[in-house]
Design a protein with these regions (language model features):
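Internal intein/HINT superfamily modules and their associated LAGLIDADG
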Residues: 1-254
Length: 254
């Protein structure tokens, strides 16, 4: 974290605002700007249901309800106002793309690819966790009644591979990556997809880390719509582990 802060202290301190190419008003951003896990929670959505256009100028996130990200953005920068009207598309201020590319030495068209994950794997735990939260929110399938784990499905094998590495760096047990064909929305042979599961032991550890993360950074930086189902699933994992540990102690005592 110290290394990250030192990098930002070298930025010009006389900067007093930032004008986004997509807006007419200036954003009020305090400099020197400290790059935090919250920034990765924001920029991480681009890997899932987002995309980058015009070399970081247009950062777009598509979701049925964009309100949680709007609220997070408004808490980060003064002057960011949003309407309560429900929309399925949100333009993220290009500032976040530019500052991320500058710090992580990424090109503008790389922040929605596996390269973002690759760079973050060497960052402190809270940064890695923030990025994983974004990926689970967009691409994870959490069924409290399904004991097979949290499924992450994507068509980009390399992204799934680096998500696996990200999970391993955090100590979360995962399955092997499996390949399958998704025939649901296609004709003919179907689209090739890749699936990774965060297993029960991984969910157990992730749950405790998520609780600590929320206490430090707030629930707005955590899971949003999938939070409720995650903790239902986590409680099942915690209960199973508790019973397993108890049985293990009883065996050793005999």
């Amino acid at each position: 974290t110290l290394k990250i802060k030192k990098k930002f202290l070298r930025r010009k301190k006389q900067i007093i605002g930032f004008k986004d190419a997509n807006r007419t008003t200036n954003f009020k951003i305090k400099f020197p700007y400290i790059f935090s896990p919250s920034d990765l929670r924001i920029i991480g959505v681009l890997i899932g249901d987002g995309n980058v256009r015009n070399d970081r100028v247009m950062l777009r996130w598509i979701q049925n309800d964009t309100t949680p990200l709007k609220k997070l953005l408004s808490s980060k920068i003064q002057g960011y106002h949003f309407s309560n009207r429900e929309t399925n598309q949100l333009i993220i201020p290009s500032f976040f793309g530019k500052i991320t590319c500058s710090l992580l030495n990424l090109k503008g068209d790389e922040i929605d690819t596996y390269k973002l994950i690759e760079k973050v794997i060497d960052y402190p735990k809270e940064y890695r966790l923030a990025l994983l939260i974004s990926l689970i929110e967009d691409e994870g399938n959490i069924d409290p009644k399904n004991y097979s784990g949290i499924s992450i499905r994507m068509s980009d094998k390399k992204i799934v591979y680096f998500i696996k590495l990200l999970c391993e760096s955090l100590g979360y047990e995962t399955s092997k990556i499996t390949k399958y064909k998704n025939n649901r929305y296609s004709f003919g042979e179907g689209n090739v997809m890749y699936k990774l599961k965060i297993l029960s032991e991984g969910i157990f550890n992730l749950g405790y880390d998520l609780i600590k993360f929320e206490k430090k950074f707030g629930k707005e930086n955590s899971l949003w719509k999938k939070r409720k189902n995650f903790f239902k699933r986590w409680e099942i994992c915690a209960g199973k582990k508790s019973r397993k540990d108890k049985e293990g102690r009883e065996i050793h005592q005999k």
